[in-house]
Amino acid sequence: MCNIIYNNVYQYNILKNIMSFVKEKNTPVMEQYLNLKAQYKDHLLFYRLGDFYELFFDDAIKAAKLLNIVLTKRGNSCGQDIPMCGVPAHSSESYLHKLIDLGFKVAICDQLETADEAKKRGYKSIVKRDVVRVVTPGTIIEDSLLEDKSNNYLASIVEQNDEYAISWLELSTGKFFHTLTSLKALDSDLLRISPRELLISEKFTEDEKIRSVLKNYKISITQHAQSFFEYSKSHRTLCEFYKIRELGSIGNFSKVEIMACGALLEYVRVTQRGSIPRLEFPKTYKQQNFMLIDASARRNLELFSTQFGEKKGSLISVIDHTVTASGGRLLKQMLASPLACSKAINLRLSTAQFFVNNHEPRRKIREILSNIPDIERSLSRLILGRGSPKDMNLLKIGLGKTLELSEFLSTLHNYCLSEKSEINSQMSFQCLTKEKEPVSTTQVISSDESELSTIHKSLGNHKDLFELLNSAILDNNLSSVKEGGFIHSKYNSELSELSYILNNSNKLVTKLRESYRDLTGIAALKILHNNILGYYVEVSANHKITSDIFIHRQSLANSMRYTTNELKELENKILTARDAAIGLEMKIFSELCSEVAKESEKIALAANALAKLDIRTAFAELAVQNNYVKPIIDDSKEFNICSGRHPVVEVNNKFIANSINLAGIHLITGPNMAGKSTFLRQNALIAVLAHMGSFVPAESAHIGVIDKIFSRVGATDNITAGYSTFMVEMIETATIVNQATDRSLVILDEIGRGTGVYDGLSIAQAVIEHIHNVNKCRAIFATHYHELTKVSKYLKNVKCFCVKIREWNGEVIFLHEVIEGIADESYGIHVAKLAGFPDSVLNRASEVFEELKA
């Protein structure tokens, strides 16, 4: 279990009394540093000095150790050496990554002018510097600090009068959500959202129940005074950010939701130091539209990671066939929040079915998608003013590929509508066959209500912007506009002239030299250069130049040196061309960013459409490769799976498929190692996949919409909360009996084994009766208590099943087949033998077993 990371754990004072050092006679640079540090005492301050970011005092001591870099010193203050360490500015992101992962906040202080500009202000003026942004775990936008296929959410939780709200946004993509919640649901919400950083009030953490929930997560916690979340302030912040008068124009908010959303925006404003990000209007997350998977079920089903914290072996590791970063992120959101609406699910399934049936369009679309960069994050950086030439180039490539994809979908649309029978060899649509499932190709492609049609429209037409960027931006991988060389020289006449000078300076000098030779008649006339005179005309002392255009510069024993106004002008152009070109490119880049900003909403819409298309084709690829089938999803209460398989276990192991027709409660008996837990989990995972809009590992599946999935499988102590294994088991079971509805799916494994036999049996039987009579939900209950099977005699919707076992020559063979009936015994001694128990212990166990049976 991971401990919570509180930022105030890392709070430290730069000096015992920082003001005493400010008053002490210091160098201008150190005085500037100390004044800035006084404003950011709780942050590491990256202070730009030339090509390095330097850290001083306690910052340096701490950073040098954590980053494994050399700790040195720079002068002294108050009679003490000043500790110092530094990192190259060009590679600072890798060091930032380490510090952010450790829970630090880093204030980035940059130079706001050049040394020459500072000199113009005065002889003793130092370069202006200021903090341009604060980097925290939840406000990262740099690609190198982010995982391509993972969201990086900043969240806030607010409570007022026992009403809770949680809001979350991602600065790197512009996504913004909010919802009402409760103390009971907080654990599930945090696990579903998985924020990197959480804003809460200092008062909020005084609640022991809140602290016990937060201890389960490795989240960077940022605490603020209650005034930071104040309602009127938050309301004003939201209205000012979105330039509206009333919040009703962008959505419905409760008072506590406004407080949560407003606090997030205020925190973004503070950390971004005036740069305005592109954020979508806050969307209400309506829980009734999604399947609720409680925190215990999320962990037990190993949706995103195994019990050991590994991604390999989780459900996401098997089903993620996406080829774009945005598709991978959206897939995780879909897995975290499966749908609970049959119409919406079936729209997704129909699109996936089309791509299952039609291989060539699927292949072509995935090929195009695989070459589309992460335009969603590049767009956000460009709008925020932190984009690079690389980002602009990636956006250009992405828009070009989006146009190609849109044209392909148009061709596909026209092809499906045409009456022609011939095969278009160029598009290779020979796989547009008659459907394996009853889904109309024409309807999926052309219907205004179809998901594919909606996706196609959302891609939009970005031809004008693409052509603009394509004419302006060279293919590049540059991380800074200050490097120059990323704008086509032909895009701008002035830049073209500067580029010509930069690339042809020798030719220009030679051309001028030849004209001077013709003018003077001196064939040996030269134009040379040195660091003192710059460019100059040189002739031997024997020659005399009479033309008025030549200005005498220097006389030597064997030569005479001159200059001309024309040569001075050329020299000035050559010397300033690079700086002028870079300045002009920066200006053009800024203009292009403005053009991108005008189209930002359309680009964001296209990026979301690309992600959806990626997932639908990925689901089809998964279905074809792993032999999945399209489930029937409706509003019934069916749960009929024919030859279902565990999607993860089957990948690397020979798997025995099992069927289930669950109308009430299935009570499953059998020994450990027989496959009960796997059977329980596989059915829950099949339900999750189906509600995502994915095909499922089975021969057939008919599932009525499930509103909630609960799981109590396995048990461990929760030491941080002070709970025993049995207490954890009881808490999880209490959640089920209190919250499950008649549309829920419950999987229960071994209730009551953490206490005495009679206690455990009594609790287990009472739970079954409650689920049957009160919750009335679909449930699979695995147990060692054979005595429980008697409930099937008086509870009409309870059926008994067992895992098939074969005994052969004194050995037990687990067949992993679930059949109707009741297990004869638990075969615990046989399992102990498989585990390697000594014969003496096994023999004694057998003796005791026979005595107990007697």
From Swiss-Prot:
Q: Which domain of life is it from?
A: Bacteria
The protein's job, in short, is: This protein is involved in the repair of mismatches in DNA. It is possible that it carries out the mismatch recognition step. This protein has a weak ATPase activity.
Task: Give the gene name.
Answer: mutS
Q: Does the keyword DNA damage apply?
A: yes
Indicate which residues the UniProt annotation says bind ATP. G670, P671, N672, M673, A674, G675, K676, S677
Q: Which UniProt keywords apply?
A: ATP-binding, DNA damage, DNA repair, DNA-binding, Nucleotide-binding
Which GO BP terms apply? mismatch repair
What this protein is called in its record is: DNA mismatch repair protein MutS
Q: Indicate yes or no for the key word Thylakoid.
A: no
